Amino acid sequence: MSTYPYRRILLVVDLTEDSLQIGRRARDLAATLGAELELLHVVEFVPVEPMGETLMPAVRIEDELLVRARQRLTALAAELGLPGAPHRVESGNVKAEVVRVARERQVDLIVLGSRERHGLSILVNFTEDTVLHAAPCDVLAVRVGKAAPG
């Protein structure tokens, strides 16, 4: 068991091209600290009003999104050299699910990506900000990419 304060690390990824960079940072930190690392991706669906036939295609699309997300998360874990690491895909509100999983798994540190913001994008409530304020543990925001001016 690790003597460091971080024994369980939750890596939260959006499965964009930045996920590998964030994953490497979390993987290296976990290895250095002797901590467990778990990967999480949350699929957030746009609510659909039930209107007969339109509901069934929406449900099939959601199921397909979950299947693809699981495949991509499994591939990311393998690319990081962590094929045996626990990884899960949840559906729902990203902030709520990240906080719920962190509590449920008694995580000591959440690692996620943070993008530089400019212009109007500064006013939007971003996931890393909301997780930071609601998390039951420390949060490490890994700086990635650059947001488009705007």
Task: Identify the role of each PLM range.
Residues 2-55:
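Small/aliphatic-rich secondary-structure junction motif
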Residues 54-58, 104-105, 128-130:
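Short, hinge-like loop/turn segments at secondary-structure boundaries
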Residues 1-4, 78-110, 117, 147-150:
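Structural beta-alpha unit
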Residues 38-40, 86-90, 140:
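General small-molecule cofactor/ligand-binding pocket signal
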Residues 1-21, 109, 133-150:
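Intrinsically disordered or low-complexity boundary/linker segments at protein termini
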Residues 41, 113-115, 143-144:
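Short secondary-structure boundary segments
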Residues 109-133, 148-149:
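Glycine-rich, Arg-bearing micro-motifs that act as flexible, cationic patches
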Residues 57-71:
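A short acidic, glycine-rich active-site loop
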